[in-house]
Amino acid sequence: QSFKNAEPGIKLCGREFIRAVIYTCGGSRWEGSPGMSSKCCTYGCTRKDISILC
């Protein structure tokens, strides 16, 4: 697979992660995923990664 066109991940920690999830999912309609917040903080997440929580 070629990752040249892949969306770059953005590191989101704490409040920034929660705000990104709420913005992407629309309000509080999202389910937690164990380890997702630490993954996004350490390695970065794409919009597609966050939309999995919706």
Swiss-Prot record:
GO CC, one annotated term: extracellular region
PROSITE patterns reported for this sequence: INSULIN
Main subcellular localisation: secreted
Single annotated GO MF: G protein-coupled receptor binding
Superkingdom: Eukaryota
Keyword Secreted carried by entry: yes
Disulfide bonds: C13-C41, C25-C54, C40-C45
Subcellular location: Secreted
Modified residues (Pyrrolidone carboxylic acid): Q1
UniProt keyword list: Disulfide bond, Hormone, Pyrrolidone carboxylic acid, Secreted
Any Pfam family the entry gives: Ins_beta
Coiled coil: none
Function: The function of relaxin in an oviparous species is not yet known.
Subunit-level organization: Heterodimer of a B chain and an A chain linked by two disulfide bonds.
Similarity remark: Belongs to the insulin family.
Annotated PANTHER family: ILGF DOMAIN-CONTAINING PROTEIN
Name listed for the protein in its UniProt record: Relaxin
Organism: Squalus acanthias
